[in-house]
Regions:
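Structural scaffold elements adjacent to functional motifs in cytosolic proteins
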Residues: 75-77
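Rhodanese-like catalytic fold shared by cysteine-dependent sulfurtransferases
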Residues: 2-70, 85-112, 125-186
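Short, surface-exposed ligand- or partner-binding patches at beta-edge/loop junctions that are enriched
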Residues: 117
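Short, contiguous, well-structured surface segments enriched in hydrophobic/aromatic residues
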Residues: 79-82
Length: 186
């Protein structure tokens, strides 16, 4: 397991505001019991926030990872170590959400295909933005991120063993996970 730490003094204050606004949208839908609408509005909000990055669907990524015709992308899991330790996509690298692009992609050529993901796509969208700004041109953010991946029963691992649950980030965002894949918050 590789964990990449943030560079000193690296903080992104707009992340909290963006998560708050996106959270309000999801909360409003949750009150109405509209889980499908939650996801629709969340994805729409994230695409509006991160207009300069490319997105990849979970089915497109699954096909890419299964393909023998093209090299697999580097998967950057942009969640906390606590979240990572519950589960992650097979072959992913754990990257601190506040890490610089240079730290997150240390040792990778600028043309390397990279796919970022987090819980729902916000933190990984910020990382994809930073990577793109640092000259990495082949970066995509996973739409729906690990929550959607898990809800679709796609492979998750912990210590190289298949697992089925995902850290819910918190009780609010965890509502986007199906009950059977939501790990208990400790």
């Amino acid at each position: 397991m590789e964990i990449i730490s943030p560079t000193r003094g690296s903080r992104f204050p707009n992340a909290r505001l963006g998560l708050f606004i996106t959270g309000l949208i999801v909360f409003a839908c949750a009150l109405l019991g509209l889980r499908g609408v939650d996801w629709f509005l969340l994805k729409k909000s994230l695409r509006h926030k991160f207009t300069k990055i490319e997105w990849i669907s979970t089915s497109e990524l699954a096909d890419w990872l299964a393909s023998k015709r093209r090299p697999a992308p580097v998967l950057l899991d942009v969640r906390t170590e606590e979240e990572w330790n519950v589960s992650h996509l097979p072959g992913a690298r754990c990257v601190d959400p506040n890490a610089s692009a240079e730290s997150a992609a240390a040792g990778l050529p600028k043309e390397t295909p990279i796919v970022t993901y987090c819980a729902v796509g916000y933190r990984s969208g910020e990382m994809a933005d930073r990577l793109r700004a640092a000259g990495f041109a082949n970066v995509r953010n996973l739409e729906g991120s690990i929550f959607q991946w898990a809800n679709e029963d796609r492979p998750l691992v912990h210590d190289d063993e298949r697992v089925s649950q995902v850290h819910p980030y918190n009780s609010f965002w965890g509502r986007l996970l199906n009950d059977d894949v939501r790990a208990p918050v400790k």
